[in-house]
Amino acid sequence: MKAGVSSACLYPLHTEDSVRAIAELGVKNMEIFINDISETEGEIFEDICRIKEIYDINVMSVHPFSSPMETLFLFSDYDRRRSTFFDMYRRYFDCMTRLGAKIFVLHGAILSAGCSDEHYIEQYLKLCHIAEEYGVTVCQENISYCKSKDIAFLKKMKKECGGRAKFVLDIKQAVRSKLSPFDIIDALDDSIIHVHVSDHREGADCLPIGDGSFDFSALISRLRATGFDGGLMVELYRRNFGENKELFESMKKIEALI
């Protein structure tokens, strides 16, 4: 297992500046949140790559800004939109090969879209097939306003994808869905290969590690029992912490439990 920090924590700072700021804290494992498609190529992308090399960063995962578009494009009934989407996401996968990132985080269709399970799984597998060409694994994240908030649906994905479905466990999203992260682990077992960590308590669902009451020791023990050997990425919203050093401190608290 490896503890790290997501560059999403410093939004709306430009992505390259977020990566640099987190690297300067001493963080070595990172998830990069791409905030615009322009950041997957050209001078901006080269700057991100330079920062990665200078600070010897292990980029474990990439999260796209375009998650809200997945409903309208990937899970649409309109074939041209899906084709456009696949072309766009190839750009993410291509830049991931340069960054060395292996995990791509997918939110998927929102609940109100009414996307059928069958259509969802079909399109997910098509995206997985494309990602595999680049050595990338598409991981479904549990999201409180998406189909993926439902444990039964996640279990169906796991079963019907024949072992190809992989998952990101997000603790704050589980809390917002009124689910126990432990129940999600029990349901998905070794299909969980990446985790977004944050603490919580009554009335506050996204806090630095140690500022809430969640039992991270039990979480790591349960994950270890499944054979989990992935990343535990601190992912907080900018309004939920003060100084940047709190991100590093949160990561170190997780690291101490691994």
Task: Please name every model-derived segment.
Residues 1-91, 97, 132, 166, ...:
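N-terminal pre-domain/capping segments
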Residues 1-4, 11-26, 100-101, 150-169, ...:
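Histidine-acidic metal/acid-base catalytic patches
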Residues 31, 61, 105, 139, ...:
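Conserved beta-strand positions in the central sheet of alpha/beta enzyme cores
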Residues 47-54, 123-130, 183-184, 218-222:
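Catalytic-core regions built around general acid/base machinery
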Residues 42-43, 73-75, 80, 114-119, ...:
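Short, solvent-exposed loop/turn segments at secondary-structure boundaries
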Residues 28-29, 58, 102, 137, ...:
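Residue-level detector of anion-binding/catalytic polar loops
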Residues 6-10, 33-37, 64-67, 109-111, ...:
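Active-site beta-loop-alpha junctions enriched in small/polar residues
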